[in-house]
């Protein structure tokens, strides 16, 4: 592999105009596709096979007039100060508003609050339920704007009108918050390299890679139904790894130039050595992300595949476009004011490794205890999906949620739809009455409506209003309690009972995600162990790496719970809303952090193994690995952290939590696990860290991530050239 990459890099260096033109053409073609072929993305999160989804499918077949699965909106109306909605003038304004909403595009029905009796006890707040003809995925931005515009007259009269529900959510914009991360990355690169050219190359290649990846995702959205969150992970990861992979290769290129090689040979050697590690690191990230498809949750699979494709593009650009750009830059990457080597003074990484080696036991204990302490909040982690309650405080969804909660209780924001299948019941109406009576006696039930039957009389709908909000544990328990009534009802009346609605759907999704987390974690840990055993030809090194990865994961879970669930440091971080942790976050974090953790493991430990194999003492090899790799790994980690942390400034709490989790995870894994625990354990074990049974040594393939085959190839070429001369 190393020799192949060496030849690819030299070809790209020589034919730089061709390679640069080819990548420019790819970017332009996909950019054109994104502009002309992209489709509408949706916010819906569904999991085939869940009870709530099965109930929706049943309603679509037996009760089409119920419009199950179609978009809904809740309109919250508050009268001006000193007025009541029961006043004739106020009533006329509200009825005019309802009439305007009925004529809005896509609206199928509006429940008049006076007829539906959805006016608060004090007469100040009303709620109008709006049903659409199409699912939320098909509600356009123009439809949403038309709905909001219908309230202009009422607002002019002094009424407060806000909108909530899945019809209002729209597609979250991927804001320019990543620009903060790019600026910090530029500063870190400039300090690391001491050259504007060297600092600019990783940024340029990363931005091109992200452009190609995002354009590809947008183009695909015209042919495949994608969730609106699909591009977010691809954007975050594409930018971060794109900078990192180029950083490793540019750093090695500068080293090869310093060794006296001409630029073309230096580019070949840099890609042949550092590029091999980039290939392996990228492959681990891709495998972890594609592995999200086995979880059985469509949105996670989409996010994983899109991000994996963007990472693959970042690898390809680092191996082909970057050496072409090095051909244009030549020796300019060194810079006129590059810092000379400091004679006699050890590098920062070497000094740190020696310190950890001398104090390995207290350092190891301190780091492990610190991880465990930070992980403590994870014991109380609650999972959920974004609702109007977690929307930005100044958004109309959040304001509508607060108004409805104020007027009718939080549960009104998340009604449960109970479906009663009476096809096998001798007396369907008696069965429905029995169901509503038993449900009304359950704890946390605020109200139960009368059963509404379809035209055939074999399926009925009952709306249950919980006392608690959609994301509360009490509501989750209520859904379980209603479902527990099904067997008893079936035995007594022959009817079957199921629960659906947006709240029940979210509960089912969260439970499925929580159940998938441990199997996916097991898959990732097993994969990590096998991959690292192949690369480092050791049992202890992979075991240490995977245990360190688990430590990073649980510590990050703890930090996320402390901030986004408990509300610690929210003012400092600019987090506007707290509540249950997004259900998808743990699995996403496991997949992404695994790939990034393996990046740092490979870049640091590869040099240790290389020196140990060539005869260095095991503990000296640890110092050597840090001497050559720590500076670049620190820069790479700071760049990753800055890119991810930039998303904490996003408007949506979902994006904020992803950005914070990834930034904190990289911080812990890079600086606590890889830079502290790894050298401490390696120094403690010495040569025993590299133990591998002979039979396993023979059975494992040799991937040569250290580039030993390239060194032999270059030595043979030099010997042949010497013999000819």
Report residues per predicted region.
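Membrane-embedded transmembrane helical bundles of large multi-pass transporters/channels
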Residues: 1-39, 107, 123, 131-383, ...
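A short glycine/threonine-centered beta-strand motif
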Residues: 77-79
């Amino acid at each position: 592999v190393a020799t192949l990459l060496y030849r690819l890099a030299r070809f790209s260096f020589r034919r730089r105009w061709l390679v640069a033109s080819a990548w420019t053409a790819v970017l332009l073609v996909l950019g054109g596709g994104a502009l002309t072929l992209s489709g509408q993305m949706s916010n819906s999160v569904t999991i085939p096979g869940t009870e709530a989804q099965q109930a929706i499918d049943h309603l679509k077949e037996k009760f089409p007039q119920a419009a199950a699965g179609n978009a809904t909106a809740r309109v919250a109306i508050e009268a001006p100060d000193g007025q009541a909605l029961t006043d004739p003038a106020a009533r006329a304004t509200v009825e005019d508003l309802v009439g305007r909403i009925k004529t809005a595009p896509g609206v199928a029905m509006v429940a008049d609050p006076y007829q539906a009796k959805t006016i608060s006890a004090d007469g100040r707040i009303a709620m109008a339920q709006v049903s659409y003809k199409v699912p939320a995925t098909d509600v356009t931005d123009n439809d949403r704007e038309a709905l909001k515009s219908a309230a202009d007259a009422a607002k002019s009269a002094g009424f407060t009108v806000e909108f909530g529900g899945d019809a209002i959510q729209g597609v979250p914009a991927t804001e320019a918050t990543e620009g903060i991360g790019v600026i910090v990355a530029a500063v870190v690169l400039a300090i690391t390299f001491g050259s504007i050219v060297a600092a600019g190359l990783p940024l340029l290649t990363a931005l091109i890679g992200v452009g190609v990846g995002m354009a590809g995702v947008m183009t695909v959205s015209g042919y495949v139904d994608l969730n609106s969150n699909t591009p977010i992970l691809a954007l975050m990861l594409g930018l971060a790894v794109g900078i990192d992979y180029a950083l490793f290769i540019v750093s090695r290129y500068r080293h090869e130039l310093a060794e006296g090689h001409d630029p073309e040979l230096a580019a070949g050697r840099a890609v042949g050595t550092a590029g091999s590690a980039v290939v392996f690191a990228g492959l681990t990230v891709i495998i972890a992300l594609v592995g999200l498809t086995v979880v059985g949750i469509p949105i996670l699979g989409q996010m994983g595949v899109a991000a994996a494709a963007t990472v693959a593009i970042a690898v390809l650009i680092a191996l082909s476009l970057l050496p072409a750009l090095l051909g244009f830059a030549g020796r300019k990457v060194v810079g006129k004011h590059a810092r000379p080597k400091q004679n006699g003074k050890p590098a920062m990484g070497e000094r740190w490794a020696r310190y950890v080696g001398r104090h390995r036991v207290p350092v190891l204990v301190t780091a492990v205890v610190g991880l465990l302490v930070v992980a403590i909040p994870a014991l109380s982690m609650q999972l959920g999906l974004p609702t109007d309650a977690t929307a930005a405080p100044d958004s109309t969804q959040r304001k509508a949620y607060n108004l409805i909660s104020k007027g009718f209780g939080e549960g009104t924001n998340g009604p449960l739809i109970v479906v009663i299948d009476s096809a096998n019941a001798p007396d369907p109406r008696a069965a429905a009455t029995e169901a509503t009576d038993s449900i009304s006696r359950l704890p946390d039930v605020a109200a139960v409506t009368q059963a509404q039957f379809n035209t055939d009389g074999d399926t009925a709908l009952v709306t249950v209003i919980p006392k608690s909000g959609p994301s509360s544990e009490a509501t989750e328990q209520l859904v379980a309690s209603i479902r527990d009534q099904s067997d008893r009802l079936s035995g007594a009346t022959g009817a079957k009972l199921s629960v659906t609605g947006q709240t029940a759907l979210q509960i089912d999704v969260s439970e499925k995600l929580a159940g998938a987390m441990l199997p996916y974690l097991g898959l990732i840990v097993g994969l990590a162990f096998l991959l690292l055993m192949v690369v480092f030809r050791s049992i202890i090194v992979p075991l240490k790496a995977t245990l360190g990865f688990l430590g990073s994961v649980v510590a990050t879970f703890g930090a996320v719970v402390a901030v986004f669930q408990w509300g610690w440091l929210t003012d400092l971080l600019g987090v506007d809303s707290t509540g249950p942790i997004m259900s998808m976050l743990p699995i996403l974090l496991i997949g992404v952090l695994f790939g990034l953790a393996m990046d740092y493991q490979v870049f640091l430990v590869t040099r240790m193994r290389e020196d140990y194999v060539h005869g260095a003492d095991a503990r000296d090899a640890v110092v050597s690995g840090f001497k050559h790799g720590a500076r670049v790994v620190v820069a790479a980690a700071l760049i990753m952290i800055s890119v991810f942390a930039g998303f904490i400034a996003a408007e949506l709490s979902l994006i904020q939590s992803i950005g914070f989790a990834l930034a904190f995870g990289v911080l812990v894994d890079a600086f606590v696990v890889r830079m502290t625990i790894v050298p401490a354990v390696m120094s403690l074990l010495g040569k025993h860290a590299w133990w591998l049974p002979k039979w396993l040594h023979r059975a494992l393939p040799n991937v040569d991530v250290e580039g030993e085959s390239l060194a032999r190839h270059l030595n043979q070429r030099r010997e042949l050239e010497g013999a000819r001369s």
